[in-house]
Amino acid sequence: MLILENVKKLYSNNRGLRSTSIQFREGEITGILGRNGSGKTTMLKAILNLLPLDEGWITLHNKPVEEQFEQIAFITEDGSFFPYMSAKEYGEFLTLYYPSFSKKRYFELLDQFEVSIFDTIKSLSKGQQLKVEISAGFAMNAKLIILDEPFTTLDIYAKEDTVRLLIEQVKEDVIILISTHNIEEIETVIDRCVVLDDGMIQEDIMMDELNECGKDLRALLDPYRPAVRK
């Protein structure tokens, strides 16, 4: 379980994340939604231990998150790889630093996505670069997978493959967090939706409960529509 307990991180403009407590369970895919400046990115960075907290703490499986680096996979459209490496070299590099990284799985996914393993990552299209990130993330055998805008540059077939991979990972009791503005693409994928606004959690609901109320994500986000839609 991933636990945020009274986590607070505010910037000089008073934006960020206000005192927040929430738990994320294994076997669930949670959508993290919110406008720019809502606290969504700050929450993800805090979980990834990319910034110091003003207050509170974060644990993954009862251990401080900063001690669980090898258990976390971060997939982002911005890319967290070394652009001058080839996809093959990148896989070799990850093998050295992540004991649970499956090179076999990585190359299988690259082949499935039809990505060249010999060209430098920088020379690939944005969509192809994201496919490298997705392949690496799902080959890490991580217990927590965080995806930040994972569908933006993917074609329809790659989106379908990525959704299938997400569902497969849930069977392995992995915690999955997805941050995106494209609510239509995650509505049938996520089990739970968390909406942030003004640095606080405004909504936290299971999708089954939402559907039983005869609502969808767009209806849930309606009060925040000017903020969520660009």
Task: List where the protein language model places each region.
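H-loop/switch region of ABC-family ATPase nucleotide-binding domains
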Residues: 180-181
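Helix-to-loop junction immediately C-terminal to a conserved catalytic motif
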Residues: 48
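ABC-family P-loop ATPase nucleotide-binding domains
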Residues: 78-123, 129-132
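The feature captures the beta-strand-to-loop junction immediately N-terminal to the Walker
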Residues: 33-35
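Conserved ABC transporter NBD signature motif
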Residues: 55-68
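Catalytic Walker B motif of ABC-type/P-loop ATPase nucleotide-binding domains
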Residues: 145-149
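Conserved structural motif at the start of ABC-family nucleotide-binding domains
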Residues: 2, 17-19
